A protein has these predicted regions:
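Radical SAM enzyme core and accessory elements
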Residues: 152-154
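Conserved AdoMet/S-adenosylmethionine-binding subsite of the radical SAM
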Residues: 1-113, 118
């Protein structure tokens, strides 16, 4: 990233934010990285820590702490939310994410990414069970509702 910035190339970090900690050596390396990062794209899957754990195997505490850290340092951030019917599309989750985002001043954009099944073959080729194989993509109305709740702008 440093070389990119030195050569006038914009830099974007696309992350789920899971490994965040304020402990070194991670934090000092992250601080250096943030000095050379123009924008962070952060995925927020679920606002409830236990539902997030059920979905990903980890709670979201590190992710939310990372978002707060980015806000503290004034790093511009885009939030992306994968909308999975029956998993991440309920009103409680969407309104909870919106309430969290309202505590941050550095969010420049919010995007809803509708769940799709295009990558199932990757899981199958690795012999990993794909637990969402019976989930259909969200309808256009469901996506629109989520975008309205989350305050997405086109």
């Amino acid at each position: 990233f440093r070389l990119a910035k030195e050569n006038g190339v914009g830099t974007v970090l696309d992350t789920a934010g899971q490994p965040f900690t304020r402990e070194d050596p991670f934090f000092s390396k992250l601080t250096d990285l943030m000095e050379n990062t123009d924008l962070v794209m952060l995925d927020l899957k679920h606002i409830d820590p236990e539902k997030h754990r059920a979905l990903t195997g980890h709670t979201n505490e590190n992710i939310l702490a990372f978002a707060r850290y980015l806000n503290e340092i004034g790093k511009p951030m885009w939030i992306r939310h994968v909308l999975v019917p029956g998993v991440t599309d309920d009103n409680e989750n969407l309104h909870g994410i919106r309430a969290f985002l309202d505590t941050l001043s550095n969010v420049k954009k919010v995007e809803v990414l509708p769940y799709h099944t295009l990558g199932i073959y990757k899981w199958e080729s690795l012999g990993i069970p794909y637990t969402l194989k019976d989930v259909d993509p969200p309808t256009a109305d469901t996506v629109k509702r989520a975008e309205e709740i989350l305050g997405c702008s086109k």
